[in-house]
């Protein structure tokens, strides 16, 4: 049976993610105490219900991170496929969302300010984030978050999932990257008026960057680095690794390099591609 645990920071979109799981055909339970998870799984099996499970867990249920990791290991040992989805957002974004909704943080009744509550929650949940697939919703609306969840669900993962993500530095760096590479020193098609309207997915940009020795050297170096270290991370039982490729605007060089790396890594690892700033390009 496939079981998805959804966790993350309050205000980051866990409820939206859970609703998308329900729309995708999962049997969903919100705010389940972790000690009840084995009983829920057993009940589901006894009913011969083949519907996949999605369970939201957070600080309201008094989540014990050590217990959570033990539960995951135990369920996997029984042959269940257990995935963890973690949603988060930047602190300033969470503060704004709480202000707009006028809702209190779940920890706010413990004599802490909102900022202190957010910091405590982030520290508390960090060990769970380490084994999860992370979605940063800072610059997402509900529809975009739903799309990100759907794209993640499409990946039939049997081993390490490698997320190749392009981003523009001027929009902020992704906070969930395991490796980050800066492409701003490479030749930039943006300064060619004929290439500026295109993205790194288009043939004119590919032809231009294919002919740049420095660009090809960079792709080779990143491929060597990634393929050297990924097996070691896999040995540590990591489920997800995010490789972030950044440049100034996020439209040309890095999109090309992410796509180039994906072609080279395809067949060796499960891949998920994200282009954060190239809005016309779908994650896949």
Curated annotation (Swiss-Prot):
<dbReference type="GO" id="GO:0005524">
    <property type="term" value="F:ATP binding"/>
</dbReference>
<feature type="binding site">
    <location>
        <begin position="58"/>
        <end position="61"/>
    </location>
    <ligand>
        <name>GTP</name>
    </ligand>
</feature>
<dbReference type="Pfam" id="PF03668">
    <property type="entry name" value="RapZ-like_N"/>
</dbReference>
<comment type="function">
    <text>Displays ATPase and GTPase activities.</text>
</comment>
<dbReference type="InterPro" id="IPR005337">
    <property type="entry name" value="RapZ-like"/>
</dbReference>
<dbReference type="InterPro" id="IPR027417">
    <property type="entry name" value="P-loop_NTPase"/>
</dbReference>
<keyword id="KW-0342">GTP-binding</keyword>
<dbReference type="Pfam" id="PF22740">
    <property type="entry name" value="PapZ_C"/>
</dbReference>
<protein>
    <recommendedName>
        <fullName>Nucleotide-binding protein NMA0948</fullName>
    </recommendedName>
</protein>
<comment type="similarity">
    <text>Belongs to the RapZ-like family.</text>
</comment>
<dbReference type="InterPro" id="IPR053931">
    <property type="entry name" value="RapZ_C"/>
</dbReference>
<feature type="binding site">
    <location>
        <begin position="8"/>
        <end position="15"/>
    </location>
    <ligand>
        <name>ATP</name>
    </ligand>
</feature>
<keyword id="KW-0067">ATP-binding</keyword>
<keyword id="KW-0547">Nucleotide-binding</keyword>
<dbReference type="InterPro" id="IPR053930">
    <property type="entry name" value="RapZ-like_N"/>
</dbReference>
<dbReference type="GO" id="GO:0005525">
    <property type="term" value="F:GTP binding"/>
</dbReference>
